Amino acid sequence: RVSIRKFQDKPVEPEKIEKLLRAAMAAPSAGNQQPWEFYVVTDKEKILELSKATPYSGCAAGAPVVIVPVYRKEGLPVQDMAQIDMSIAQENIWLETDALGLGGVWIGIAPLKDRMALVHDILKLPENVEVFSLFALGYPAESRKQQDRFDKSRIHFVE
């Protein structure tokens, strides 16, 4: 999988969006707490607002879809693990995006409180959830090759 930051002006089919969210919700989570909810943004004006949420989110402006994963702030058996759980769910979305012939880019929001609050306000989210990230996606308008990042020097065996 690679980060895709340029998208075709073509909508993503609802069936494909559902497959992405099914992949996310298939993720394991600490204590099986499944802390996630997902906001699927297709409104161009809202996407434009979200694209200004961070210094690195400008690429979202051209995406037909932005998925905003959020997690519950309270009532989780292992609250401290919620962001790790969200990372696993987010990666599942990314892998499924690639499998469906789509492209996407993960835009970090949490744990930076100012970014979390800004996205929360833009989408008028309920008070009981925290914003985890933005995931801009669509049909790729660019082609990028996966780089081989394998580095044996980073592997250490303890025998």
Question: Where is each model-derived feature located?
Answer:
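Acidic, surface-exposed loops and disordered segments
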Residues: 1-159
